[in-house]
């Protein structure tokens, strides 16, 4: 029983650090999500290309708004900041699929 409590406590502690870092990074103050800030290598570019139109348009809106705010040296009002609890990693499933396909192609090329 004590082991479960220790795991639960360490999970809460780790989650607290994640929330702190999410807010400390600052991208949420510009209305960006974590996946909006990923470096765009070839895999990420392909995953972005595969996004449904509505997700792609939402992403572009957030990025353009953040660029505009950054240029003006402003941030959004606090009620418009993206929240850790509301974060959905919209690009992750597409990126995993692209990486899996690339690795599969590399395996086929070895044979």
Swiss-Prot record:
The modification N-acetylalanine is found at residue 2. One of its GO terms (biological process) is oxidative phosphorylation. The keyword Repeat does not apply. It is found in: Mitochondrion inner membrane. It holds the Pfam family UCR_14kD. It is a peripheral membrane protein. One of its GO terms (cellular component) is mitochondrion. Component of the ubiquinol-cytochrome c oxidoreductase (cytochrome b-c1 complex, complex III, CIII), a multisubunit enzyme composed of 11 subunits. The complex is composed of 3 respiratory subunits cytochrome b, cytochrome c1 and Rieske protein UQCRFS1, 2 core protein subunits UQCRC1/QCR1 and UQCRC2/QCR2, and 6 low-molecular weight protein subunits UQCRH/QCR6, UQCRB/QCR7, UQCRQ/QCR8, UQCR10/QCR9, UQCR11/QCR10 and subunit 9, the cleavage product of Rieske protein UQCRFS1. Component of the ubiquinol-cytochrome c oxidoreductase, a multisubunit transmembrane complex that is part of the mitochondrial electron transport chain which drives oxidative phosphorylation. It is linked to Mitochondrial complex III deficiency, nuclear type 3: A disorder of the mitochondrial respiratory chain resulting in a highly variable phenotype depending on which tissues are affected. Clinical features include mitochondrial encephalopathy, psychomotor retardation, ataxia, severe failure to thrive, liver dysfunction, renal tubulopathy, muscle weakness and exercise intolerance. Belongs to the UQCRB/QCR7 family. This is Cytochrome b-c1 complex subunit 7. It comes from Homo sapiens (Human).
């Amino acid at each position: 029983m004590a082991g479960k409590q220790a795991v639960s406590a360490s999970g809460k502690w780790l989650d607290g650090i994640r929330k702190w870092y999410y807010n400390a990074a600052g991208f949420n103050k510009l209305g960006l999500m974590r996946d909006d800030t990923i470096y765009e290598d070839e895999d990420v570019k392909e995953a972005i290309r595969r996004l449904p139109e509505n997700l792609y348009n939402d992403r572009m809106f957030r990025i353009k708004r953040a660029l505009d705010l950054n240029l003006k040296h402003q941030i959004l009002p606090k009620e418009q900041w993206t929240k850790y609890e509301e974060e959905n990693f919209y690009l992750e499933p597409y990126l995993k699929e692209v990486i899996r396909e690339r690795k599969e192609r590399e395996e086929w090329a070895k044979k």
